[in-house]
Amino acid sequence: MFTVFLLVVLATTVVSFPSDRASDGRDDEAKDERSDMHESGRKGRGRCCHPACGPNYSCGR
């Protein structure tokens, strides 16, 4: 039973690492001014052409 517990803990730890690394790349892209995800200072609302931003930001294209 203890062995099964250890396997579950290790499996969840290994699976969670790649998702953390993927979000770091998105953060870098959002900070890049040339990216579609970058916010501009227009009218207090940013410009974002990424599909996830759709309801909150205008694309401006």
Curated annotation (Swiss-Prot):
InterPro entries: Conotoxin_a-typ, Conotoxin_a-typ_CS. Keywords: Acetylcholine receptor inhibiting toxin, Amidation, Disulfide bond, Hydroxylation, Ion channel impairing toxin, Neurotoxin, Postsynaptic neurotoxin, Secreted, Signal, Toxin. One of its GO terms (molecular function) is ion channel regulator activity. Its main location: secreted. The keyword Protease does not apply. Residues 19-46 are annotated as: Disordered. The keyword Signal applies. Residues 17-43 form a propeptide. The modification 4-hydroxyproline is found at residue 55. The modification Cysteine amide is found at residue 59. Residues 1-16 form the signal peptide. Residues 21-42 have a biased composition (Basic and acidic residues). Expressed by the venom duct. It is found in: Secreted. Alpha-conotoxins act on postsynaptic membranes, they bind to the nicotinic acetylcholine receptors (nAChR) and thus inhibit them. The cysteine framework is I (CC-C-C). Alpha3/5 pattern. This is Alpha-conotoxin-like Sm1.1.
